[in-house]
Every structure is written in C-alpha cells, then in structure tokens.
C-alpha cells in the first residue's frame, strides 16, 4: 500500500497563496502528484486524471472540491485534522475511482478548554471555534470562511459590476460525545457554496453538503466496531435573466450506511 499522510501542522508550514493555506495544492508537492494546471485545485496521481481521484471528507464523498473556479479548494486548513492520500493498493472499503483516494478528517475540537483561531487574507477571512460542552465528554468544533472580493465591485464605478455577485463561503462542524467508557458518537458536517452572476448576462453556482454520523465501540484492546451513516449532496446551477431567461439544475446525492 502506497500512502502519504500529512497533519494540519505540516500543511500550514507550506507557503500560502494570497493568505490561504490550500490542502490540495500542498499535496502536489508530494512525489507522484502533479497539478492539473495553474489556477486549478485538482491534482493528478501517477498519470491519472483528476476525475479518477476519490475525495472523501469524514467518510463522505465530495464531488467538487474547488472554490473560485478551482483557484482554492473547499477544505479549510483550520478545520482539518489530517490528510491521507492512497496512491496505490487502496483499501477494499474505498471504490469507484482508479487513480487515488484522498481521505480528509476534520478536527475533533478541544476537550479541555475553549479556543479560537482566525485569519484575514486578501480574498477571504476565516474563524474557528472549539471547546468542551461537557469537559472530557462532549466537545465541538465550528469553522467558517467567506470571500469578500464582491464587496469591492462598487469601487470600480462600473454599473454592470454593481449588479454582479461573486463570492464563496463554507462551514465546518464536528461534535464528539463520549457516552461511555467504550462508546463514542461523532457527528460532522460541511456546507459550502460558490455563487457568481454578471448583471443580467448569466448566473451560476455550485455547492457541497456532507454529513456523517459515526458510532465507535471498543470491544477489546485489539478489536473495535464502527457504524456510519453518510450523506453527500452536490448541486450545480446555471441560468440567465436576460431576454432569453433559462434555468438549468444538476444534482448528485447519495446516502450510504457502513
């Protein structure tokens, strides 16, 4: 099995682009990984195509991992615990892709004390909150990010831009509960969206929504049991409001129980 693992701390050591740490762009620095091109967040593994990579976030498949036409990935580095990339010999529980599996896990939150972390970049700002609800038993993590380059449109004094929209945002959440010495419940979710429109010429947007509920039980020092319910929903919308208005919607949605 060929697998590379990166922690959030290692990912943040990589030089940032426009103040944003990009998880997928960091992977292109690993052996056998190449970018699909400048200004794109996809990646190729050992000659495979970008659509041959299975990307999962807390067990939920992600069908579009890009913000801003591929300029950034949807994964907020402040909400990521670690990243595993399987480049060959993928485990049997992963399927549907030929090239690789990118397994991203969200942070579980601080179980001892409350903490906050944030940052302001050239294109977006972010904020992460984490802490205990019941100390050492129930804890949470919340992270949000939004771009604000659309707020500068009025400064250009172009009437068409005043009616234009261009932004992205995403939210990450995770709740962990230790219900007994042997049982834990994990609930995680992600929601993100990109929205663009140019006056009455066109409008389009896309977004992902994933959620995972997992029960973990320790049977013995060598054995444990996991049961998961995973939901993933991807939407893409295209339309226009001019003389020939139209709306076109596309959607991929699935529910998996493991």
Tell where the protein language model's regions lie, with residue ranges.
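Extracellular loop and loop/strand-boundary signature of outer-membrane beta-barrel proteins
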Residues: 67, 113-115, 157-161, 196-202, ...
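Transmembrane beta-barrel wall of Gram-negative outer-membrane proteins
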Residues: 121-146, 160-195, 203-231
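Short glycine/proline-enriched turns and hinge-like loops at secondary-structure junctions
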Residues: 95-97
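Periplasmic N-terminal accessory/gating domains of Gram-negative outer-membrane beta-barrel systems
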Residues: 1-90, 101, 107-108
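Structural signature of outer-membrane beta-barrel domains
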Residues: 50, 60-62, 107, 123, ...
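Short strand-turn segments of transmembrane beta-barrel domains in outer membranes
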Residues: 70-73, 81-91, 100-131, 139-146, ...
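Membrane-embedded beta-strand positions in outer-membrane beta-barrel channels/transporters
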Residues: 24, 42, 82, 87, ...
């Amino acid at each position: 099995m060929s697998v590379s693992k990166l922690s959030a701390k290692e990912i943040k050591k990589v030089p940032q682009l426009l103040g944003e740490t990009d998880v997928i762009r960091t992977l292109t620095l690993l052996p056998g990984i190449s970018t699909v091109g400048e200004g794109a967040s996809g990646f190729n593994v050992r000659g495979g195509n970008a659509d041959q990579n299975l990307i999962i976030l807390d067990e939920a498949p992600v069908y579009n991992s890009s913000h801003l036409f591929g300029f950034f990935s949807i994964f907020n580095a402040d909400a990521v615990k670690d990243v595993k990339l399987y480049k060959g010999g993928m485990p049997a529980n992963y399927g549907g892709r030929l090239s690789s599996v990118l397994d991203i896990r969200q942070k579980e939150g601080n179980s001892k004390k409350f903490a906050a972390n944030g940052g302001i970049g050239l294109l977006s700002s972010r904020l992460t909150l984490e802490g205990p609800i019941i100390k050492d038993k129930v804890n949470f993590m919340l992270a949000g990010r939004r771009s604000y380059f659309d707020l500068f449109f009025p400064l250009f004094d172009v009437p068409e831009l005043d009616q234009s929209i261009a932004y992205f945002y995403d939210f990450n959440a995770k709740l962990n509960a230790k219900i007994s010495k042997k049982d834990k419940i994990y609930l995680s979710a992600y929601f993100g969206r990109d929205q663009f429109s140019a006056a009455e010429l066109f409008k389009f947007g896309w977004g992902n929504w994933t959620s995972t509920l997992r029960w973990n039980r320790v049977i013995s020092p060598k054995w444990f049991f996991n049961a998961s319910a995973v939901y993933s929903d991807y939407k893409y919308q295209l339309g226009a409001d001019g003389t020939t208005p139209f709306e076109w919607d596309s959607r991929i949605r699935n529910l998996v129980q493991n």
